[in-house]
Amino acid sequence: EDIVLKAMPLFDEVIVAVGINNMKKCAFSLEQRLQWIKDTFADYPKVTVAHYEGLTVDFCKENGVKFIVRGLRGNADLEYETMIAEANKKINPEIETVFFLTEPSLRCVSSTVVRDLIKHNCSVEQFVPENVCLKSENLKT
């Protein structure tokens, strides 16, 4: 939510595109994640939600997207995201990557942290948008 809100003033439209990565174990179904994102940004007409398989740069080309927005929590994210941005640029030179720093209070948040907290029945409300209700019984096993 933080990064999308930061990007909104710079772009006419912001597409929150969820990439399907079969190598990654997701705690919640794609449908559930897409719905949470749609609900989170329901009051923002500039924000649309999509999903895709394959390369992000291919999604961008197919949808006329010129900028990829990424959030950075720290140095590790910067190194990783820089490598990805450079690879994307080699694949499609028309694509630029824009980085935003995550709010300090959210820098500790990752899907792994949230998933572990849920598994241990800890509250995650300070880490996720208020419309997202995460409970251990909803986790995919």
PLM region spans:
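Nucleotidyltransferase catalytic core that binds NTPs
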Residues: 1-141
